[in-house]
Amino acid sequence: MYIPQGNSLLSGTIRSNLLMARPDATEAELQEALQVASAGFVMDLPEGMDSPCGESGSGLSEGQCQRIAIARALLRPGGILILDEATSALDPETEMQLLHNLYERYHGQKTILFISHRDAVVQFADDVVRV
């Protein structure tokens, strides 16, 4: 699954955006994906996952949109995840938490490829290629 830098959310609810990845996902699977993606803030919104998000995620910050897009990608079946500057709008602390969560949950289970200008990713990498 490819996750680009830009916002890829569609108009609807956060839940509908997540379910695009896997329509049969359970509530627990949706919540786990949000937790791993450091998007637990969703559960604090007045309507939780049923909170609306406009086209391109309007109503949410760019960093929030990125984390929801990552959560959606985590719901897709498959063994490869490609994050292309997908944490660019996150503050360093949130980025580190997300990277830690991904490592703890998927290390050895999925191949995760980070394309990034940030050095935070390096400590979670098995291999680093600099171009």
Can you annotate each of these PLM segments?
Residues 1-6, 14-17, 33, 51-131:
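ABC-family ATPase nucleotide-binding domain "signature/switch" substructure
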Residues 7-52:
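Conserved "ABC signature" C-loop
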